[in-house]
């Protein structure tokens, strides 16, 4: 469960009663797509003939460019998550990251789903002794990609939703891990 019971109005679009502008919604979608794309090879190495996660990332970006409607991007996200379901480990998490990225068009808060699943994919791809450091590096890499205009919003949201995102954004002591 990556979505909170109580929505943050800063992550609800203006047309739905929140304060999130379309421009910032687009930035969140692009960032989520970047996070998912960064780990996509962990899926494609295992499932080279399945392009559903790649198409989901492409649809997320196409939605930002107004080339596809929200429902098309969201549907592509569902197909990517369908590609994830029969798998295990890094490939599964990478496909889920792509699916979450495409669903940002529908619900902006899926941005952290894409980021969290990407971090989990990296962690699942390495030996347990290397896991914490690999996940920390991925988290920091993601934060380095954040557009300045939404950086504080995303970092605050990571802090707020860390517990429901498998604690990948901060250690169990509440401190930021990256």
Where do the PLM segments sit?
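C-terminal binding/interaction regions
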Residues: 20, 124-178
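Structured binding/interaction patches within domain cores
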Residues: 1-139
